Amino acid sequence: ESSFAEKTFAVFPTLVFGGNLGKKSKYPVSYLTSGLKEIGKWLWLARFLKLDSKFHFIHANDIAQICGFLIKNHKEEQYKGFRKFVLGQKFISIDDAIITLLKRHNMRRFFAIPLTKKILKILLRILPIQTTPWDSFSIKKYDFNHVPITNPETFKLKSYAKSLNDILRLSKLPSCNNN
């Protein structure tokens, strides 16, 4: 065992949000946060689909908070040795995310067609849609629910962005700042 083992930890962030879209910032905007600008173009269509696939997300501030805590407290007994942490908030379904976004954009859902894994695979075969290897992996995996999941509350800290509503508010996307 290496002398570095007790000081070593690995973090595996789930989907990372961070930065804001409303003004210039000294911090970069994450790929996912920058993608929030595109949601309005597709939300009208997404509201008619129901996807139960689950995922976790985490804000960059929460990642920094957890890493800072682990660096300062690596000598404590419960954190000794090489540790692995999957970082994220409690999972939400894609459908829950769509509903949250619809509320933020003052849109309604009248009905939704369940888009199962099987239907999704068929659509990808018959429609002229190109998928990347990551897209294909994600469709096969379908659910990205990790156990255990680590967030600031794991260490008795307070999350900067615990919910998707927090993410939308902090992103400073103009249509998403109506609490």
Roles of regions detected by a PLM:
Residues E1-K23:
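Conserved beta-loop-beta element that borders a ligand/cofactor-binding pocket
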Residues S3-A5, D52, M107:
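Short, well-ordered coil/turn elements that cap or connect secondary structure elements
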Residues T8, R47-K50, K84:
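Short, functionally important structural connectors and interaction interfaces within domains
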Residues A10, K54-F57, F91:
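Short aromatic/basic micro-patch
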Residues K24-V29:
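Acceptor/aglycone-binding surface of glycosyltransferases and processive sugar-polymer synthases
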Residues Y31-I58, I66-F69, Q78:
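A conserved pocket-lining segment of Rossmann-fold NAD(P)-dependent short-chain dehydrogenase/reductase
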Residues L43-A60, R125-P148:
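Low-complexity, charge- and small-residue-enriched intrinsically disordered regions
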Residues D62-P133, N151-N179:
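Mid/C-terminal beta-alpha module of Rossmann-like enzyme folds, strongest
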